[in-house]
Amino acid sequence: NKKLPFWAGIVLAMKEEGISAPPISILDEDGQLTEATHKVLDIIAKYNMILTTGHISHEETFALVKAAAEEHNVKNIIITHVDFPTTYYTVEDQKKLADYGAHMEHCYTTYATKKVDYATTLEMIRAMGPEHVVVSTDLGQPTGLYPDEGMEAFATALYQDGFTAEQVRQMTVYNQRKLLGKD
């Protein structure tokens, strides 16, 4: 019996209260990005914001990232949870997305909660290279570690598994600064 993520408990409580939020898609019935999605991409590009993919489908991700990079000139893209079971991207998929300038996000909690084997996370990071990776924690829920503790644990694991201190800094600091327009 797996422990539910913190947010899943909220969704279940809302359902019990009769509150529902139907799923939405960024694609129309023809598989094209909706007009509303294009408007959001225009805003992201205009203000040099970061586009993240969240938990959307692979079909949506590839359509979104292609349009963001090619049609809207979005410069800062993160593919969220690339090694999470429901949003899992192969290294081949990640390389295609990186061709659009996207960074791949790996979260401490994904392997720490045994949703993926750490060796898989490590293999993906090595295949992509630190220049295409951002690491985060996905922590902050009231029942878990503090985010800084998770980041320290992830950085330490990467260092112990052969990444240099500079490579770890690239994945934990420099790539994020670049995405934020601070470099």
Q: What do these predicted regions represent?
A:
Residues A36-M49, D161-A165:
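A structural motif corresponding to the C-terminal end of an alpha-helix
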Residues P130-P147:
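Short acidic/histidine-rich active-site segments
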Residues D42, Y47-V116, V134:
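Catalytic pocket-lining loop regions of alpha/beta-barrel enzymes
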Residues L51, M104, D138, V168, ...:
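Divalent metal-coordination and catalytic microenvironments
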Residues N1-T34, F154-A155:
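Active-site gating loops and adjacent loop-to-helix segments of metal-dependent hydrolytic enzymes
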Residues F62-A67, Y88-Q94, K114-I125, T143-T156, ...:
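Histidine/acidic-residue-rich catalytic or RNA/ligand-binding cores of hydrolases
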Residues E70-K75, M128-G129, Q160-T164:
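Short helix-capping segments at alpha-helix termini
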Residues G150-E152, T156-D183:
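Mid-to-C-terminal alpha-helical segments outside catalytic/metal-binding sites
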